[in-house]
Amino acid sequence: TLRDFLRKDSLRQQQEKFRIRGIREKEVLSSCGHVAGRTRFDREGALSCNPKLKYHKLNETMRACFYEGSWRREKCRSFEIFASQGDYPLKGFHYLLAAMPEILQEFPQAHISVAGISITGYGTLKEKLKISGYGKYLRDLMKVHDLEGRVSVLGNLTDRQMKEAYLNSHVFVCPSALENSPNSLGEAMLLGVPCVASRTGGIPDMAKGDKSALFFEKGNVHELAACILR
């Protein structure tokens, strides 16, 4: 898109930026003596860069408001699916959109809410000029799957607003292509929200499959739909 060209930020250019970050991260880890982490994924990754590292397990503390209150089925919005982010490909929002036709076959009332800024707006000239390649792809997916009116973008949310979004949802979905230990999944589980997450990176170390979360193989939209339908 024009925006991607002017900002030198196409999907391939974003891939290259991640590649460069990876090289720099390896350089940093190679010069360190100690590193802190919390999953097998980050431990194995760090030690593969520098086998001499001393690894320290350090679990995260969530924001205070997520330790209070709990999800209740009778108070949530039925068939509401919540995702915490979807503005770049690694977050896997396109997988959730692609899974919607199967979900809608069984539950026509299903609706997606996603936190963060809208990257699919195309109503004004400014929005048409600013849309990214990924935003256009998401927009095309919504057209192909007839999802107009079934996806709401909530904007940037405070911690309290995020908590409200979790509690209002019927299920929280983390469809990412790669994660280490996403805070969003931790927050949702603390509140007792039913969770669906991709089996990737460090996520399997955060939750017990079929107990605190349902896992699907990353990118498998049929498994994703099946987990949500459960």
Predicted regions and their residues:
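Membrane-proximal helix-turn-helix segments that form the acceptor-binding/catalytic region
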Residues: 2-34, 48
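Aromatic "clamp/platform" in nucleotide-sugar-dependent glycosyltransferases that forms part
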Residues: 177
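Nucleotide-activated donor-binding/catalytic signature segment of Leloir-type glycosyltransferases, i.e.
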Residues: 126-156, 160
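Short alpha-helical donor nucleotide-sugar binding micro-motif in glycosyltransferases
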Residues: 156, 164-169
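Short hydrophobic beta-strand element within catalytic cores of glycosyltransferases
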Residues: 194-197
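Conserved donor-binding/catalytic core segment of Leloir-type glycosyltransferases
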Residues: 72-91, 97-100, 112-113
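Conserved acidic donor-binding segment of nucleotide-sugar-dependent glycosyltransferases
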Residues: 209-210, 214-221, 230
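A short hydrophobic beta-strand element within the catalytic core of glycosyltransferases
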Residues: 172-173
